[in-house]
Amino acid sequence: MKKQPIEAREAIRMGIPSKGRMAEDTQDLLKSCQLSVRKLNPRQYAAEIPNVPGMEVWFQRATDVVRKLMTGDVDIGIVGYDMLREIGNEDEDLVIVHDALGFGGCHLAVAVPQAWDNVNSLSQLKSDPRFSKERPLRVVTAYVNLATKFFKDQGMENVVITTADGALEAAPAMGAADCILDLVSSGTTLRENNLKEIEGGRVLDSQGCLVASREALLKRPGVLEIVHEMLERLEAHLRANGVFMVTANVRGSSAESVAEKICSGGSLLRGLQGPTVSPIYTPQNDGTTKEGQFYAVSIGVPKTRIYETVKSLRRMGGSGVLVFPMTYVFDEEPPRWTSLLAQLGLKAEDFNHLSRGEAPVAR
């Protein structure tokens, strides 16, 4: 696959899926991170993200997002891990920036007819006497590369793989294939077509991921900075997902005594790193304020444990309890950013030099 030279264009480009649930989920996630995609004309395939000036957004089929990353036509992409593995085929230039964007969750697996009572595992399928060199197992899939590698790794030689783009579940009933290898989410479609998964037949787990070209990250000005900002926003939003801030007024003699009381209530009341305790200034009759009677305690807790937290705070004398969702939780530095720099052979000071248009520090 011929690769476009870096100097062939100046604009930074990101490719995202153009159709289907993956496209909707991608844009919803970006919008949640204040990275809304704006398309001036609904018929156009090019768009922009106003909060990221200088970057073009291109709507492409999922397969083409990966291909255009490989050819250098886009620098950044959002795509399912399944498609990255199938089309990217472990291309060393493709770097996974974020491997768990929280949507598109599914897995790629082998499914056989439910009528095959004696085939409930891959080992049983492998030893099935019905299939031989003269009469190989016929597998239909849209993931030819992954299927070929999977069956080879399992030592299954008597397999013929055919390709199809849709309605794979109908192939065994039609007699066009013996089994399928396809994406599974809930498994409902398999059951409705009288198919079943087998033990050991799971090829990989998949969900949406953020991918970038290694060459673009290192050589195209601005790409690494944009990826850093996107990663910060994504990590902060995803970390806050399902986390609520609970605030209560607690009586105490000092902030330290209140903090000790809260922490003694167990791990639930310790929040993300520990409770935040702040003095409340109570208005007095003479117009002044008095500190030290009540303290505001704020704790980040999972949504599923909100009421349990409220009850615990009440037992400690808490009142005026407020609960509100968190939108972002920014870390000191996202762990995935540190990991990305390591994959690129860079350190934090190298990023600072690159962001100023300078060469990385020689080592």
Where are these regions (language model features)?
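Small-molecule-sensing regulatory modules
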Residues: 2-59, 78-107, 116-363
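Conserved, well-structured functional cores that handle cations and Mg-NTP chemistry
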Residues: 65, 75-79
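Active-site charged/polar residues at nucleotide-handling catalytic sites that mediate phosphoryl
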Residues: 72
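Periplasmic solute-binding protein
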Residues: 110
